[in-house]
Amino acid sequence: MSDIKKRILVVDDEPDIGLTLKIILERYGFTVDSFADPETALKNFKPGLYDLIILDIKMPEISGFELYGKFKSKDANFKALFLTALRELDDYDNLKKNVFPKMGERHFIQKPVSEKDLLEQVYSILN
């Protein structure tokens, strides 16, 4: 990665998870904005500002996939990492086969997220 600070947006309806991700990522030099409310995140979204958006897939008001689509309609130049609490292998297979190829994104990570796994994914996506 270059010396320019990468900016990340985190959207997770569980405030503790959003805060934890923010703390971890900031510790490694990223600039992070975190929102627990998807609509607030959308209202505060500025095209061209974020290198990566980390989205919870399952949120009460709007799914991470729907929110991703709304962000993409405003700015096509960011990358995305989806968070999921899905535990069943069949659910993962469905995501990989049916959802991600249509969206052009295949990056996802299972909750609870370890610091190591999070950083590996983020560095891999941004490099």
Q: Which residues are covered by each model-predicted region?
A:
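Non-catalytic signal-transmission and effector/linker regions of two-component phosphorelay proteins
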Residues: 1-7, 114-127
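Receiver (REC) domain active-site loop signature in two-component systems and cognate sites
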Residues: 59
